[in-house]
From Swiss-Prot:
Residues 1-21 form the signal peptide. This is Phosphatidylglycerol/phosphatidylinositol transfer protein. Coiled coil: none annotated. Keywords: Lipid transport, Signal, Transport. It comes from Aspergillus fumigatus (strain ATCC MYA-4609 / CBS 101355 / FGSC A1100 / Af293) (Neosartorya fumigata). Residues 22-37 form a propeptide. The gene is npc2.
């Protein structure tokens, strides 16, 4: 009984203070919340640039994924186009991180020239316009849930080719 009356007394004493505190502003009324600028990749895809892409070596014009979002057990069609501002040679690399919710599934650095062989390209990648069309058969046993992908791509000299994120790619249980 004593605990209840102490709590009630505390509430009664703090109620006027909390009522007056609502009218006190710790911030200038003209201040706005911080809004982070995002840089989505054009096309039907879940991709965003990690930061302003204007200084990147690869200027992506568009990326279209069909279906979007990708579905387990189905073929994913990728159509992409862009412009390389300079030649990309052997030694370029990609730092890749894939997460399932908060769990990191993959965190590795890989040779870009080895990886692009999977999409029928090879190094050196010459300066200029490029297109990519690829069909990828997705396994039917992708665990359901939300995935996040982060890829930083650099030349052999450490110059940024591009940096991309894909957030909340959701795979659902197929009926």
């Amino acid at each position: 009984m004593k605990l209840i009356s102490t709590a009630a007394t505390l509430f009664v004493c703090l109620a006027p203070l909390s009522a007056s505190a609502r009218s006190i502003s710790f911030f200038d009324s003209t201040q706005a919340p911080i809004q982070l600028e995002t840089f989505p990749v054009k096309g039907d895809n879940p991709l965003v640039y990690c930061s302003d892409p204007s200084g990147n070596i690869l200027q992506i014009e568009s990326v279209d994924l069909v279906p979007n979002p990708p579905l387990p057990g189905q073929t994913l069609s990728i159509n992409a186009s862009g412009n390389l501002k300079e030649r990309v040679e052997e030694g370029a690399y990609v730092a890749l991180e894939v997460k399932y919710g908060l769990i990191t599934l993959i965190k590795q650095t890989a040779d870009l020239c080895e990886q692009i062989k999977n999409v029928d390209l090879e190094c050196p990648l010459e300066k200029g316009e490029m297109t990519l069309t690829k069909q990828v058969d997705l396994p039917s046993h992708i665990p359901p849930g939300k995935y996040n992908v982060h890829a930083d791509v650099y030349t052999k000299d450490g110059k940024k080719i591009t940096c991309l994120d894909a957030h909340d790619i959701e795979f659902k249980i197929r009926p």
